[in-house]
């Protein structure tokens, strides 16, 4: 599995701000979107381009355009919505597929409760977004759904990832690509990433 920890100074700085204990909902939400945008920039660096001729201000001009690769952004509800706008800043024509999976607080197992995928998802590259890759259960379950629907070009974008989640994802889906702003130390006894970001969903939606 291709694993990319984005080490750009802007990414590291913004993620550091997100780790502050007393950060406001507004600021956390803004930074989640901004880091999501920067991760998208990295994840789409290998998209193929082609030369096309357009009418420029001085006549015909040859330019580069993305070559036919359709994209669907797949936020995992609910926290993934906090990164979606940042992703769409880079790929505004992408279609949106939504998957609802939550983690049972006692068993730590993923529980699916909603999915709405674009009709031609088998023709698209999926950018799956979720702030945290902890145990990996929710992400694995989401990718299971995408592959069952015929989508096999999948990239995962997360703000922080635990080594345990990375290992689980690689074992279940070695063909996907992972882009993260940080690979953190690991999980605590409750299954939360340390040092992590706390409960990203609560911080994004102001329910902390």
Swiss-Prot record:
5-phospho-alpha-D-ribose 1-diphosphate binds at residues 78, 103, 130-138, 199. GO terms for molecular function: GTP binding; magnesium ion binding; uracil phosphoribosyltransferase activity. Its EC number is 2.4.2.9. Uracil binds at residues 193, 198-200. Its cofactor is Mg(2+). The keyword Glycosyltransferase applies. Allosterically activated by GTP. It is an enzyme of class 2 (transferase). One of its GO terms (biological process) is uracil salvage. Pathway: Pyrimidine metabolism; UMP biosynthesis via salvage pathway; UMP from uracil: step 1/1. It comes from the Bacteria. Keywords: Allosteric enzyme, Glycosyltransferase, GTP-binding, Magnesium, Nucleotide-binding, Transferase. The keyword Magnesium applies. It catalyses: UMP + diphosphate = 5-phospho-alpha-D-ribose 1-diphosphate + uracil. It holds the Pfam family UPRTase. Binds 1 Mg(2+) ion per subunit. The magnesium is bound as Mg-PRPP. Catalyzes the conversion of uracil and 5-phospho-alpha-D-ribose 1-diphosphate (PRPP) to UMP and diphosphate. Belongs to the UPRTase family. PANTHER family: ADENINE PHOSPHORIBOSYLTRANSFERASE (PTHR32315), URACIL PHOSPHORIBOSYLTRANSFERASE, CHLOROPLASTIC (PTHR32315:SF4). This is Uracil phosphoribosyltransferase. It comes from Pectobacterium atrosepticum (strain SCRI 1043 / ATCC BAA-672) (Erwinia carotovora subsp. atroseptica).
